[in-house]
Amino acid sequence: MAQFYSAKRRTTTRQIITVSVNDLDSFGQGVARHNGKTLFIPGLLSQENAEVTVTEDKKQYARAKVVRRLSDSPERETPRCPHFGVCGGCQQQHASVDLQQRSKSAALARLMKHEVSEVIADVPWGYRRRARLSLNYLPKTQQLQMGFRKAGSSDIVDVKQCPILVPQLEALLPKVRACLGSLQAMRHLGHVELVQATSGTLMILRHTAPLSSADREKLERFSHSEGLDLYLAPDSEIFETVSGEMPWYDSNGLRLTFSPRDFIQVNAGVNQKMVARALEWLDVQPEDRVLDLFCGMGNFTLPLATQAASVVGVEGVPALVEKGQQNARLNGLQNVTFYHENLEEDVTKQPWAKNGFDKVLLDPARAGAAGVMQQIIKLEPIRIVYVSCNPATLARDSEALLKAGYTIARLAMLDMFPHTGHLESMVLFSRVK
């Protein structure tokens, strides 16, 4: 007769232990050792001692939280944001920018088994040109919450300021809160997005019930008084333009239009430097044929087309392909072809795969580009630039190129999101002759 037992949950004792942190992981957590086990401790820096309690105990590692810090690292800084430690947006405001960059670079070097050649960075504060703020009506107080999610929770931190937002957006926060908090539809608001484009500021309001004419008038007056382009979104697919023209931003000498819901890099400064460095690494020549995979609306594709003989961009989202084609026309680029294809399927039968290319750039999502690596190898490009938002899948995909005879010529850490645990990077692979 079979017997069934419920699995025993590993319990943690609330015993206080003293640890010394000797390293940081890529997420900015302090790393310590206790009784032969690795401990990950948010909020601690290298060279700091602290009393901690274990919150999660696994076979190979444990997580802990600080009870009392006993010493401070010389690289500890006072967080600029009053919400730091509660808001889930930032994890590393307590660390110097230099330490953040060094620890992320070290984590990247360990994963890639290669020295980081450079850090591509820009201003560490006031860099974020897009924000999505959750909205929640509190019946007891009849107040509207507006802010970001708490770390590890769906609760909202009511933010009054956010120093990583570009100054124009941070200055808008109290005004947007006051406007939305005066609407009759307070109970039926989902979130509000703020975007700073070169053309001006956008506000996209998601509402879950129809707005009254009084609310619409109030929002329209607010948009005019603050010089905003206003968009209303009754669901996740539709939005209505209330005021404003098609938004656009400057990028590497080009003017790129975009829809309010289109993905654009939130850090304009690092994006400009990243694109410029990618073109430099590829050493684009007037006779080159260049392939850009996971191209989006042409963040790399269009700048590449200003230097190459021809460029092909491949993207899985049809709206972004359409926007890329439109921006090519607007910028007078006639040597660009965009394809709408799913790069997670069999790419060998896709029309772009029949062409020859001298150089390749790819910028996949977090899942990486496992499905296209063999096709890239078949193309035998001289140089490949891989832009990554996930170092684990980058390391995995790199193995295929290294086995095929490519070498890592350059490796850069992209400081796209200072004060957070996000690690982005860019690699140049060269074919061994």
Curated annotation (Swiss-Prot):
Residues 10-68 form the TRAM domain. It catalyses: uridine(1939) in 23S rRNA + S-adenosyl-L-methionine = 5-methyluridine(1939) in 23S rRNA + S-adenosyl-L-homocysteine + H(+). GO terms for molecular function: 4 iron, 4 sulfur cluster binding; iron ion binding; RNA binding; rRNA (uridine-C5-)-methyltransferase activity. The active site is at 389 (nucleophile). It comes from the Bacteria. The keyword Iron-sulfur applies. S-adenosyl-L-methionine binds at residues 265, 294, 299, 315, 342, 363. SUPFAM superfamilies: Nucleic acid-binding proteins, S-adenosyl-L-methionine-dependent methyltransferases. HAMAP family: 23SrRNA_methyltr_RlmD. Belongs to the class I-like SAM-binding methyltransferase superfamily. RNA M5U methyltransferase family. RlmD subfamily. Catalyzes the formation of 5-methyl-uridine at position 1939 (m5U1939) in 23S rRNA. This is 23S rRNA (uracil(1939)-C(5))-methyltransferase RlmD.
